[in-house]
Design a protein with these regions (language model features):
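Conserved ABC ATPase signature
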Residues: 37-41, 45
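Conserved H-loop
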Residues: 91-97
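Catalytic Walker B motif of ABC-type/P-loop ATPase nucleotide-binding domains
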Residues: 62-65
Length: 159
């Protein structure tokens, strides 16, 4: 029911809602958890359920505002890998807002660094890595160099 909510709010019939919700649940790997209450799901599973809910509407662009900030680092990496596959398989684009430099560089084709107040763009980085990105990219020397440059900009250009 939770995953069907947006479809219901958009006036879709029950049968169509159920079909779209089930397809989205399968896309994010939550089969078998359809009848579980949100409080019984792990943090990563809650993020997947949220993504499934949005996927039911098949938007061309997703806004991700700190979507994985509440999960541990390993779960975050798994969710990044899975979300990247969804980008590729489902053909949508995403605007990713994050405080994690590693996540920004891994998930993006372009990273924009913003100042605190007022929030202005102070730096822009084109990320050269091809999709699909392999998890081990996070240990690549060029990945580390770019992440370091982003970090430097976040500190106001100081080492």
């Amino acid at each position: 029911q939770n995953v069907e909510l947006l479809c219901e709010l958009h006036g879709m019939q029950k049968e169509e809602r159920r079909s779209l919700a089930q397809a989205s649940i399968e896309l994010v790997g939550l089969e078998g958890f359809e009848s579980h209450y949100p409080k019984s799901l792990s943090g990563g599973m809650k993020m997947r359920a949220s993504l499934a809910r949005t996927l039911t509407l098949k938007p061309p662009v997703f806004l991700f505002d700190e979507p994985f900030g509440a999960v541990d680092e390993i779960t975050r990496e798994h969710l990044n890998d899975e979300t990247q596959q969804l980008f590729l398989n489902e053909g949508f684009a995403g605007l990713f807002i994050t405080h994690s430099i590693t996540e920004a560089v891994f998930m993006s084709t372009k990273v924009l660094v913003m100042s605190a107040r007022p929030g202005n763009i102070v730096a822009e980085f084109d990320i050269p890595f091809e999709y699909p990105r392999k998890p081990d990219l996070r240990f690549d020397a060029e990945f580390a160099r770019i992440s370091g440059e982003v970090s430097k900009e976040l500190r106001g250009g100081h080492s």
